Amino acid sequence: MGRRLGSKQLPPEQLTKNLKKPLPRPVVVAFVQHTGGDGKSTLSAAVGQQIATHRRDRVIAIDAAVAAGGLSQRLPVQNESTIQTLLSNLASIHRWSDAREHTSQGRTGLELLTSGDSIADDAVLTAAGYERVIEVLTANDTYNLLLVDCDAGVTGELKDAILDSADVIVVPAAGRDGVSGAVVTMNRLMYLADKYPHRASHYRGLISTAVVALNHIAPKSILRDEEVATMFRERVGVREVVSVPFDPTLKDGSEVDIMLTGKATSNALLQLAAEVVTSLRRSV
């Protein structure tokens, strides 16, 4: 496990080199999955830490949820400000230092903008609100790389707005239900391509550059990774599939620290992060 399935394995040195390759503009990576329980927030945090560790860019993880999102349990939170606080102060955000007042930051340099834990109607993130946040955080190179953790409970206009903003998507899949949910996610993109012909190339591009992460959240799995990877590549048309082995340090929704993971998991997360950057370089 912990490998690039069906493809030539690259040494860590080459993966790191690929991960560091330049990007021409600010980019958005959306972690999306139709179902819950696939370790999406965990992988969002882990990939973000890998990217922040190896790149000099400003990297931020955003909790895109209608209520309490998962990233605030996976990354350190030192700031009471939330995405709604940022929205209320958009007029004052002109540069990175302004945005930084609303984020938390871990030792890798990865920043976090949380969704907060309020379920009040006026605290619910809307599609329009999300679009304004992305617009402000990508303006003037405020942040170079934005990782958006799309909560499984996000549907409708907000989810479509997240997909619209994405340059690349990462789709975690754990077990049979996760694989089915990943296929549903891809089918949603095809539906949007048919519904909005003027945006069809964008939605089809998200499929062709997508990275699927077969996430092993238990010590044993009944899935055959190579068979699943072949299905995603040949029938669905994604660009890459990476297997992430089970790691006890990443279970139970605990805080993520990539320095604590085992070697196989560390290599898999490095692989996953490198594949994300490779997909970004093809899409922008």
Residue positions per predicted region:
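Beta-strand-loop-alpha "switch" segments that mediate conformational coupling across diverse proteins
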Residues: 216-262
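NTP-binding/hydrolysis catalytic cores, primarily Walker-type P-loop NTPases
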Residues: 251-284
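Phosphate-binding/switch loop-helix module in NTP-utilizing enzymes
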Residues: 105-107, 112-160
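Conserved nucleotide-binding/hydrolysis micro-motifs of P-loop NTPases
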Residues: 65-68, 117-120, 152-153, 176-177, ...
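Walker A (P-loop) phosphate-binding motif
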Residues: 19-51
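Phosphate-binding loop that captures ATP/GTP phosphates
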Residues: 54-111
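Extreme N-terminal, non-catalytic leader segments
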Residues: 1-31
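Conserved catalytic-core segment of NTP-binding enzymes
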Residues: 140, 150-236
